[in-house]
Amino acid sequence: MRLAVALGERDPDSLDFYAGPEEVVAAVRGEPPSLRAIGLAAGALSARVSAERLDPAEASRARALSADLAAMMARVDLLTGTRLPYDKESVAFFGVAPAPIDERRLAQIRSQIADVVGHGGRLVDRYTTFAARFTVPADRLPDVMRAAIDECRRRTVAHVALPAAEQVTLELVRAKPWSAFSRYLGDGQSVIQINTDFRFTVDQALQVACHEGYPGHHTRNTLMAPRRDASARPPERSIQLMFTPEGLESEASAMLAADVAFSTDERVRFVRERLFPLAGLDAAGAQRHVDVERLVGELQMVQADVARRYLDGELEFARAVTQLEDRALVPHAEALVKYINQYRTYVTTYTAGRQILAARLAACAGPNPADDVRWRCFQRETLPRGAETIP
């Protein structure tokens, strides 16, 4: 825990949350180690973990600790000047690199989108114009987000045992590199921040509610982290480091949260009957809106490809922006490239990570699974054994 807190003090982007004893933070801040000292200590601890003779019940915990420590050392190397090619950096942090993308399939998806939003001119412009019809007005966004969060929670607690006192608080912010962020405070409490510099369509608002809240980040963190009434959790569960294999699992599960909470028909029905009226928008196009957003979501793998080429020096800033607009239909492409400047290979977590987890869920649940099967597989594939049990 001390190493993770120390790294977070030196590099706030590395630490998603810490919900452990405050005295650890005080001790680190009283005598903060250098990045080099953190890297050396992580290496020494990794060697100790590897040398331990453990029973099978502890072996998986040791493997996870070793992977996180290796990723921590790689992060220290990056912060102290080491630069690796995108794929090697991604493997060092997350254990995986994005697979080559299927350009033919992506072209088919863009063609399907064009059939809905119209032909002629740049597709990103036509998609942006189409999406504007479903964009939540700024003054109505808080009500839409709260209703979406409430429904995502209602569906989640029907399948997942959450502690009675857990809750999320909604906060509107500006001038952030991301569109939304969930900050876990500990003991089942999170703050979901929504960046109002971005615009959200109705379906995107629902995706954010599930992703950041239920059954996404807040739910996962609540179930995994120790609480005052459940101190038996391993202490490392009090920490979420972003640039680790655990960080990839967390982001991948959040990316699929809306698909677990809602079938396609349920999703269309809820946005049409509940969110469109709250947004003050005509719900006649709800089906087409959800269909197009699903297709645009399938283009996200382009983001990893562009990030790889950009960070490896094959694309300059302006060309990276253009490729994100033309190939992935990203409306805030400049903001995304600035995000890549700051978070680099974290793009892997919500692109390749999503693909990997989606394949595991499909293998577990099979085609067209019933709700209870879908939820059971989601918990089994995204949470360590026992994390879903509330004492």
Model-identified regions with their sequence ranges:
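N-terminal maturation segment of proteins
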Residues: 1-391
